[in-house]
């Protein structure tokens, strides 16, 4: 298995982020407005670079020769340290789905949120038709907390939004908690 490296999202990742978000297999499962433009994403990045209520990351694999490949972009948004909660999101390279990358990213983000940020709860939203993601979230300890009916306009139609959450105590019970070996490497 190649080495996995995580670092904060950087400007150099934005072109790839735009390509992934504009991929039908990605935007079909998310409630984002498309097309996503590079100029708009650069503006978003500049506005949010120092925003302390979010933490965006990029996951890479590194082969034996040292070459790096982006495999996922993910993060915690709406970080609320007073109420000790944050929303989680994950986008896997569309060419690399089904390889456990999403699971690794979810586990790493939970570990980061609960260990580093001392969160009480991590939650996320998904659309009902994204059953693959729902299965992943349930396997990693998330619980379906409810369904927000006709909550968002998705691909021209109003659709429900599923709300999943995991509490700190539930995370502490997860067997994978101590097995997640991905480490954050922050350039100095």
For every predicted segment, state its role:
Residues 13, 100, 130, 156:
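Conserved G/P- and acidic residue-centered "switch" motifs that form tight phosphate/ATP-binding loops
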Residues 98-112, 131-139:
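Conserved acetyl-CoA-binding loop-helix of GNAT-fold acetyltransferases
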Residues 115-125:
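Conserved GNAT acetyl-CoA-binding A-motif
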Residues 137, 142, 164:
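Conserved active-site tyrosine of GNAT-family acetyltransferases
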């Amino acid at each position: 298995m190649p080495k996995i490296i995580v670092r904060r999202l950087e400007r150099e990742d934005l072109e790839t982020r735009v390509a992934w978000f504009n991929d039908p297999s990605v935007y079909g499962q998310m409630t984002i407005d498309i097309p996503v433009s590079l100029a708009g994403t650069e503006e978003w990045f500049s506005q949010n670079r120092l925003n302390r209520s979010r933490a965006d990351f990029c996951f890479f694999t590194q082969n034996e020769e040292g070459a790096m490949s982006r495999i996922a972009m993910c993060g915690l948004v709406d970080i609320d340290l007073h109420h000790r909660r944050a929303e989680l999101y994950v986008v896997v390279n569309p060419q690399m789905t089904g390889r456990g990358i999403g699971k690794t990213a979810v586990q790493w983000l939970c570990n980061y949120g609960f260990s580093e940020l001392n969160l009480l709860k991590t939650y996320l939203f998904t659309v009902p038709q994204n059953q693959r993601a729902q299965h992943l979230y349930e396997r990693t300890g998330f619980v379906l907390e409810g369904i927000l009916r006709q909550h968002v306009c998705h691909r021209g139609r109003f659709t429900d939004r599923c709300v999943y959450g995991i509490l700190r105590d539930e995370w502490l019970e997860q067997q994978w908690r101590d097995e997640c070996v991905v480490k954050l490497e922050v350039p100095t």
